[in-house]
From Swiss-Prot:
Residues 1-28, 93-108, 188-201 are cytoplasmic. Residues 50-71, 130-166 are extracellular. NCBIfam families: A_tha_TIGR01569. Pfam families: CASP_dom. Its main location: membrane. This is CASP-like protein 2B2. It is found in: Cell membrane. It comes from Arabidopsis lyrata subsp. lyrata (Lyre-leaved rock-cress).
Length: 201
């Protein structure tokens, strides 16, 4: 995505235009790095939670703890899978744009990317919040409702879930930063869309 939105006019200086292009390239490189990190963290989070299983024998009865037992963890896995796939596609687009040196001129496409980033960011925040609340209940219990501390029996399961939530949190922070960058990029297009009129003396 291009973040310049500044056309070359008779009043623009070539040096200034070159400087703006360098700034634009740095922003796009930053976006590429962030999207790659989000993809990695989201994928790790989904794998950690989805593969987390622990079996305990209680009074000769085997009890298995898995992520599907908690709807919040299922939601977290699905959301992080979506975030990883979306970030991978956008990272590839950023890389291709950098290699070709092309800029995004289509405002509808810029808005589509903006709304996509916003949606994924909000979903990531919701997923982490729901999973963190469920994890807190599993760790601390709820004496008033006679909810026991599940993590006292399934320590390994809870530890791996905690690692998954931590990885999802990093992915969430990255998506929030990316959504800010895409918002800046969209509104930057409109900020420089009108050519400057030369003043008359």
């Amino acid at each position: 995505m291009s973040y310049l939105g500044v056309g070359v006019s008779p009043g623009n200086v070539t040096g200034s235009s070159t400087k703006m292009k360098l700034i634009d390239r740095k922003v796009r490189v930053t976006e590429l790095i962030l999207r790659s990190l989000v993809c990695a963290f989201a994928l790790v989070a989904a794998i950690l939670v989805a593969t987390d299983v622990q079996v305990r024998e209680i009074f000769t009865i085997q009890k298995k703890a898995k992520f599907t037992d908690m709807k919040a963890l299922v939601f977290l896995v699905v959301i992080n899978g979506i975030a990883a796939g979306y970030s991978l596609v956008q990272a590839v687009c950023c890389l291709v744009g950098l290699m070709k040196g092309s800029v995004l001129l289509s405002e509808p496409l810029a808005w589509a990317i903006f709304f996509g980033d916003q949606a994924v960011a909000y979903l990531c925040v919701a997923g982490v919040a729901a999973a963190a609340q469920s994890a807190a209940f599993a760790k601390l219990g709820q004496p008033e409702l006679q909810w026991m501390k599940i993590c006292d029996m399934y320590g390994k399961f809870c530890n791996q879930v905690g690692e998954g939530i931590a990885s999802a949190l990093f992915a969430c922070i990255g998506m929030v930063l990316i959504s800010c960058i895409s918002a800046f990029g969209v509104f930057r297009l409109y900020g420089g869309s009108k050519p400057r009129q030369s003043s008359r003396w």
